[in-house]
Amino acid sequence: MNKGLCNWRLFSLFGMMALLLAGCGKPFLSTLQPAGEVADMQYSLMLLSTSIMVLVIVVVAIIFVYVVIRFRRRKGEENKIPKQVEGSHKLEIIWTVIPIILLLILAVPTVLTTFKLADVKAMNDKKRDKNTVVVNVRANQYWWEFEYPDYGIITSQDLVVPTNEKVYFNLIASDVKHSFWIPAVGGKMDTNTDNKNQFWLVFDQKATDKAGGVFYGKCAELCGPSHALMDFKVRPLPRDQFDAWVKKMQNAKKPVVTDPVAKEGEAIFNKSCIGCHAVTPLDKRPAQRRTAPNLADFGDRERIAGILEHNEENLKKWLRDPNSVKPGNKMAGTYGHLTEEQIDALTKYLMSLKVE
């Protein structure tokens, strides 16, 4: 008896801890803080379905408790046979019609929302408005590539989009199945190797300001040992700032290095790293040859490898042993041993990669 009670207490304790930890996430890394039109629609459907489920549970629980108390066996009536009821057409109609009504209440807005979210005609129109933003998202183990086909720009890890308007996405994977998800803004949708998925999102400017100008995205499909580390950042900008960013990226030149140590790092980079990485956003290589993240704006990024704080020490840690940071990544083992001097030089060079 005491052992069972002890186990029950432990179970209750772990249950309370799980509930407490569920509320400890970062701001705007939750579907419960919608930050755009799609997120608002999905949140409304969650509230609707949850409300219906709670209503059903409460009503059934009340009826259950009432029946247990009202028709319980009383003292002295142990041998009394209760009145036998063959059935009730009225009750049968009620408990058939009510679920149908509840299903319709849930189904109608769900179907309408599904068709609205699936409307991507604007992105497939060859004569689409020049201001319509389309992003080709390519998922790789364990990093993200973002291509803006109408602007000729390619970036990695940091997604830049305009606020308060629809942004359309083409989703595909280069190796295994992944899933593109920005919890606060909407999603999620799978990226497959053999077909493209399409959808759209809207990034709210007020919510962006509250979030500090950055949203967090993740891979939401188990894809390997570093699945949990396959993050990316989203930087929504007002339309005028987004246009300025596009112009800056389109006019980007090959970086000119003046620092002697950084020059040494550039030489090391050009011997091997350049075969996979690019240092300009105007990368003309086909997708099959873009086997590693574009590093054009590496010096201005939020994170190293999508997860480490952006500083020189973490970059050196990544260069020494990428597998210790992201197990199973494809960069590990592609280059020989680097001396500390070479790592220092590479770090200096990579930190200087900025689009001015």
UniProtKB/Swiss-Prot annotation:
Catalysis performed (reactions): 4 Fe(II)-[cytochrome c] + O2 + 8 H(+)(in) = 4 Fe(III)-[cytochrome c] + 2 H2O + 4 H(+)(out)
GO MF annotations, alphabetized: copper ion binding; cytochrome-c oxidase activity; heme binding
A matching Pfam family: Cytochrom_C
Location in the cell: Cell membrane
Membrane protein topology class: Multi-pass membrane protein
A single BP term in Gene Ontology: ATP synthesis coupled electron transport
Every Cytochrome c domain range: 260-356
Chain segments carrying region Cytochrome c oxidase subunit II: 24-259
Positions bound to Cu cation: H178, C219, C223, H227
PROSITE patterns linked: COX2, COX2_CUA, COX2_TM, CYTC, PROKAR_LIPOPROTEIN
Cofactors: Cu cation; heme c
Transmembrane segments: 45-65, 93-113
Annotated signal peptide: 1-23
EC numbers on record: 7.1.1.9
Key words of the record: Cell membrane, Copper, Electron transport, Heme, Iron, Membrane, Metal-binding, Respiratory chain, Signal, Translocase, Transmembrane, Transmembrane helix, Transport
Entries under Gene3D superfamilies matching the protein: 1.10.287.90, Cupredoxins - blue copper proteins
Cofactor details (free text): Binds a copper A center.
Gene Ontology annotations for the cellular component aspect, listed alphabetically: plasma membrane
Task of the protein: Subunits I and II form the functional core of the enzyme complex. Electrons originating in cytochrome c are transferred via heme a and Cu(A) to the binuclear center formed by heme a3 and Cu(B).
Similarity field: Belongs to the cytochrome c oxidase subunit 2 family.
Protein name per the record: Cytochrome c oxidase subunit 2
Gene that encodes it: ctaC
